[in-house]
Amino acid sequence: MATLDDVRRIALSLPRTTEHLVGDNTRFRVGRLVYASVSADEERLGFGFPKEERAALVASEPAKFMMPLPADERYQWVRARLPALDPEELRELLIDAWCMVVPKTIAARYLESQGIDPGRTGPG
């Protein structure tokens, strides 16, 4: 079961990430680009995810993943029930979302330093 504290610990370990409280949501971003957002009740995590892959992700585990809110459908974004995620899955989702908003050289350097295959796709 993942929590806001897990999101915070993972996200703030990623280069250039800053945390911001916007409204009641806790957001993690690089510069002005948000890549993760936790709802005020800490039940939902929104995160960057390729638009063309999100329907398949949601269909694969509908009890865990949800499409973005209608206002966010134009973005590369999807939502998850935070307590349904295990910490390792959360880590992979956040790293993948972060890689979408940082320069490719920074992402590649970080992934290499962590022994993560930059060619892997999605959780798992």
PLM regions: where:
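Charge-dense, helix-prone N-terminal extensions
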Residues: 1-124
